[in-house]
Amino acid sequence: MPKTVSPGVQALRDVVEKVYRELREAKERGEKVGWSSSKFPCELAESFGLHVGYPENQAAGIAANRDGEVMCQAAEDIGYDNDICGYARISLAYAAGFRGANKMDKDGNYVINPHSGKQMKDANGKKVFDADGKPVIDPKTLKPFATTDNIYEIAALPEGEEKTRRQNALHKYRQMTMPMPDFVLCCNNICNCMTKWYEDIARRHNIPLIMIDVPYNEFDHVNEANVKYIRSQLDTAIRQMEEITGKKFDEDKFEQCCQNANRTAKAWLKVCDYLQYKPAPFNGFDLFNHMADVVTARGRVEAAEAFELLAKELEQHVKEGTTTAPFKEQHRIMFEGIPCWPKLPNLFKPLKANGLNITGVVYAPAFGFVYNNLDELVKAYCKAPNSVSIEQGVAWREGLIRDNKVDGVLVHYNRSCKPWSGYMPEMQRRFTKDMGIPTAGFDGDQADPRNFNAAQYETRVQGLVEAMEANDEKKGK
């Protein structure tokens, strides 16, 4: 029986579907469409009426749909190092034409060779096992084992059975149907990997790169020199967008987009703040699912309305003393880092079993950009988990721990995000010293499942539970 969803959650899903549907339709009409980093000022593109897709959002979706490993491997096969970000590898493979595909058709025959990407027929007419001795159906997903194929290679084939079989084998979910870009928008306030990633896409497709460089900020504020530097880049970006669209910049439309983005951000932060209630009216894990909206549509009024509707639903849960969490809250934890999208069920299962509700999420409120003028917009976009000093990063998190009544911290040492993971050992020490709460870390990856070990994760979660219980005993809880 399908899980019922609330009107607010459904509205959020509809917004994301609309963004990608309109993106594809714009491309089909012959309009220029782009790809954008998640923290590029969306207000600019929105004010020009440009349709853009978000490779980070796409990569997370591809990974969650179990194609992260094969897409990462495809990128490695064409020369990208497996040390770089999993999102980048998936996106670079996608930009090169690779798509997730089924190895076999419904009758158990090979559609394509998993090693060469070419069609491979079974000489005996039917296959029970593939070339590696694996069953036709993956027992974990109950789906055919996945591989990749290349859309450019398929397009070059003559019309016929092989071309049809390979086209039909391509995975059809939404994240696999983002059209190729005519320009890219990059802001490296997230990390410097973003810069080379988007440069590579622009070079491969011979398209414009609109770049906004945000300096690392070692202070507790954004100084005026950085504001002037970034504002000058916004002026350049506007001129580039005028060239792409053939339109003049419209300040009134820009102002409206800024109002929409602020309204969305405030509603999003309000949703996040409901985790301060004890017990929380929802499971903080849900914030990861809702982030697609705040990334792809924060400049749209529909996103603001959807988050406001969700906030009203959460307010009602608080009044009634109910929750949408599927378990009783026994401990409240902060999840540090980006989730392992390919392994969400593995992440959630031991949390549910131990009654651990995630009531602190660093990643989610980082997309709540609130400002009153252009200088404040610049300052808002300067703040990201990887673009500020460790002192400011600790202060943010310790404020979240206090406000959201966190009992312990679970840290994801993310192989894909080394800047974020690099300073976490020191942060863990600070949390224990300053806040008196236990922490535990586990190894993983936001997109490549090969870097996640379920047994290690379960052991670390159990250790965190025992440490929190010991802490409770000391406090006489």
UniProtKB/Swiss-Prot annotation:
It catalyses: (R)-2-hydroxyglutaryl-CoA = (2E)-glutaconyl-CoA + H2O. Activated by the HgdC. Reversibly inactivated by oxidants such as 2-nitrophenol, 3-nitrophenol, 4-nitrophenol, 4-nitrobenzoate, carbonyl cyanide 4-(trifluoromethoxy)phenylhydrazone (FCCP) and chloramphenicol. Irreversibly inactivated by oxidants such as hydroxylamine and nitrite. It is found in: Cytoplasm. GO terms for cellular component: cytoplasm. Pathway: Amino-acid degradation; L-glutamate degradation via hydroxyglutarate pathway; crotonoyl-CoA from L-glutamate: step 4/5. The keyword Metal-binding applies. One of its GO terms (molecular function) is 2-hydroxyglutaryl-CoA dehydratase activity. InterPro entries: FldB/FldC_alpha/beta. Keywords: 4Fe-4S, Cytoplasm, Flavoprotein, FMN, Iron, Iron-sulfur, Lyase, Magnesium, Metal-binding. This is (R)-2-hydroxyglutaryl-CoA dehydratase, subunit alpha.
